Amino acid sequence: MLFFIVRLILCVCFFSFLMPLQSARAQQEIAMADQADIIETPEVVVSATKTPIPVARVTSAVEVITAEDMKRQNLRSVIDALRLAQGVAAFSSGGPGTDVSVRIRGGSSAQTLVLIDGAIVNSATLGQYNFANLTTDNIERIEILRGAQSMLYGSDAMGGVINITTKKGQGPPTVGAFLEYGSFATVREGGTVSGKQGIVDYSLALSRWDTSSFSAVNYRRGATERDSYRNWTGSARVGVDLPKDGRLDFNFRWTNSDVALDNVSATSPSDVFGSKNRSQEYVFSGSYQQPLTEWWSQKLTLSRAQEASLFLPGTLQRNLVTGAFSTPFGTPNETRVLSNRIEWQHDFRVTEMLLLSGGYQFREQQGENDSGLTNRILSSNAGFAQAQVNLWDRLFGTAGVRYDSYNVFGNATTYRLTGGYYSKETDTKLRTSYSTGFRAPTMNQLYFPNFGNPNLGPEKSQSMDVGVDQFFLSKSLKLSGGFFWNRYRNLIVTTFDPVFCAPFSTFQFCPQQLGDASTKGWEASLSYAYTSERQFLRGLTFQAQYTNTLTRDLDTAARLPRWPVDQWSMVIGYQPIEPMWITVTGRYVGSRFNTTGNNQSLRAFDVWSLAATYDVTKQVQVYLRAENLFNEKYEEVASAGVPIRSIFGGVRVAFSAKP
C-alpha cells in the first residue's frame, strides 16, 4: 500500500507540472466546448432493461466504457479496459493470447455472460468466455452490468453481464489506418472504412497484431523462452434504415490467432518448447426492428458464435523447479463449439408511466473435441416479461419474470425487482435491486468422457444491492456508493469421490453439486469531467473506483480463490493544449489466495500506465503508451508471466470525403 501511495503522489505531481500549460489555452474555448460532450457520462443505457433508458432512471449497477475511453488510453485489448472497471477481476495466465478469465462481484468466470452484438460467446464446453483474443478494434461501447441478470439474459448471467457493441458508421466516407511498434518486437497495423450513404451505414475494420511477447511462465521463476502471439481480426457492421423508423443491422467479427504456451503451474511450472494453441473465432448477428404502431415495437435478433481451437502439446519441456527435461504430456486436440440464438422481443408503451416488454429466446449449444467428446447439443426455450414504471421522473422501477426450459435438466424460473428514486432538487439518485439467477452445467461437466456427470442440475443464486448516486456541478462531478450481497447454491465442484464417481469416471474425480458460497461488499466511485461553462480544472477528467469484496465458501469457510478483498482503479486524463491528451491509469489489487484450499497466497500489487496522443493535423495523430511504469513485479495467477516496463508508439491517419 505504501508503494501505491508513493506512485499516486508522483502521478499527481506530474499533472501539477502540466497545469501551467492550461493558461495557454484561453483561445481554445470553442474547440474545447465541442469536445466536452465526448467525455460526458453516457445518457442512455440499453443492456439494463433491453430498452434504451436514461442513466438517471437506471436502477442496476452499470458501468459504460466508450470507444473514446479506449482510444485515449491507447488500449489494444478489451481485457485491459475491463481490468479498470468496478467490481471486475481479470486474471491472465501469461502474455497476450493466453487464457484470460473475468469475474464480477466474487462470482466465477462461468457466471459472467458475454455478448458481442447480441451473440452469446460463452464457450459451450467451458462455460466462460476467453477474452484473450478480443481486441478493441471497431468496438463502440462496453456495458458492464453487476449482479444477477438471469431474468433478462438466462443462464450464465448469475454474476453479471458484459455487453459489447460494434461501431456504427456515420458521416461522409472515411478511410483510416494505424501502425504501431514497441517492446517485445511488437507490430500492430490495421485499417478502417466507415460512413453513411443514403439509408446504408457501414463500419469495417481489419488488423494484425504480431509480437515475440514474453514467457507465459514468470521470468522470475527462471523462464527464458519467449511465447509469441499473432492475431488477425476483422470486423464489420452494416445497417439499413427502413421506412417508418425500421432498421436492419448485420454484424460480423472474425479472429484468427496463434499463441505459444507454457505449463503455468503453481507448484511445478515448465518452459514448453513448441506448444501452441491455434484458434478461429466467428461471431455473426443480424437484427430487424420495426415499430408496428405508435405504442408497439418489435425486434428480432439472430446470432451465431463459432470457435475451433487446436492445442499442440509441444516437443520438449524443462521443469523450472528441478531443471529436468521431459516430453510434454498430451496429444494434439481440437475443440469445436457452436452457439446459436434467436430472440424476438416486443415492447408496449401503455402510458407515459408504463412500458411492458415480453420476449421469446431460443438458445442452442454444440460441442465436440478429439478427446472423445462427441457432438452434443444443449438447447433451451425461454420466455420473459418485464414492466418498467416511471412516475413523474422521480420514482421508477422494474419487475420481471422468466421461465427457461432445457432439454437436459428441466426448468428454471428467475425474477428481478428494482426500484429507484431521483431528486431533481439535489440531483440525487437512490437505487436498489433484488434478483435470482441460475447457470446451466457445461457440456464438459455433463458429458466429458470419463469425467462428466449427466445428472447435474443448474446452479442457483440470489443477488441484492443498494446504492446512491450524487451529482454536482451540472453532472460533471459524480459520487457513487453502494452495498451488494450474493448467495450461491448448488455450485458444481470437482470432487474426489470413488463411490459417487464410479458410474462416470475411472479416475474417481467427477463434478458434483455440493458447493454453497456467498459474496458481499461495498463499492465507491468518484468521477469528474470538465464542462464548457466552467474554467476551474478545465481539461481534466478523473475517475477513481474502490471495491471491497468478502467471499466465503460456506462449506469450508475458506475465501474464494483469486478474489482480493480490496481493489482500486484510477484514470486521470488531461488536455494541456488542444491537440494533446494525456492519460494516466493505475490499479491496485490486494492480496488473495490462488487455490480453493487457501494454501497459497498471491501478494498485492499496483500497476500504472501512461498514454499520450497528439494531433499533428486533423488527419494525423501520433500516440505513445507506456505500461507497468514502475516495473512492478507481480503475478495475477501463480507462476504466470506479466509484462515488464514496456513502451509502444504509433501513428493513426484518417481521411474523409467532403460531404
Model-predicted segments: where are they?
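Short acidic/polar hinge/loop motifs at secondary-structure boundaries
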Residues: 119-146
